[in-house]
From Swiss-Prot:
Biological source species: Vesicomyosocius okutanii subsp. Calyptogena okutanii (strain HA)
Record-given protein name: Ribosome maturation factor RimP
Cross-referenced PANTHER family: RIBOSOME MATURATION FACTOR RIMP
Cited function: Required for maturation of 30S ribosomal subunits.
Protein's gene: rimP
Predominant localisation class: cytoplasm
Alphabetical list of SUPFAM superfamilies matching this protein: YhbC-like, C-terminal domain (SSF74942), YhbC-like, N-terminal domain (SSF75420)
Similarity comment: Belongs to the RimP family.
Any single GO BP term: ribosomal small subunit assembly
HAMAP family attached to this UniProt entry: RimP
């Protein structure tokens, strides 16, 4: 699935940035006619529904011409929300010390889901140290399928 999101990122990142927003990341969930293409945007001010609508209209026009995904799908443009998704190494670095929930592409020691605090990020090894109830574990960022901040209330 990385190829689809990479292609879309290349296509839309300059457009979104030209509109004054940051492209945080893309999720593509393939499920036949119920597939979802979710685009996360941010800015230094809060994202409104109107912001999402404006970006969605612009991207819809581009996708109608370029057709980066074959078949039907629903386009969703969203703010990161309170449980912000993390897509890149830089995102993990920005949120050192924060609680996260991770879902891996494949199990590691029989476990696919992890919860803990981001302890450190290694530039050299492309890994994060996740500190949880059972201690620290080093995880390869490329093996993380989905990551979100977890907010404690």
């Amino acid at each position: 699935m990385a190829r689809v999101t990479d292609k879309i990122t290349h296509l839309i990142k300059p457009v979104i940035e030209g509109m004054g927003y940051e492209l945080l990341g893309i999720e593509y969930v393939a499920s036949g006619k119920y597939s979802i293409l979710r685009i996360f945007i941010d800015t230094n001010k809060s994202i409104s529904v109107n912001d999402c609508e404006i970006v969605s209209r612009q991207l819809s026009s581009i996708f109608d011409i370029e057709e980066p995904i074959s078949g039907q799908y629903n386009l969703e443009v969203s703010s990161p929300g309170i449980e912000r998704p993390l897509f890149h190494k830089g995102h993990y670095q920005c949120f050192l010390g924060f609680n996260v929930k991770l879902h891996m592409f494949r199990p590691i020691s029989g476990q696919s889901n992890f919860f803990g605090v981001i302890g450190s990020v290694s530039e050299i090894n492309n890994t994060i140290e996740l500190v949880g109830e059972l201690g620290a574990i080093i995880l390869d960022i490329d093996l993380i399928k989905k990551a979100n901040l977890v907010v404690d209330f």
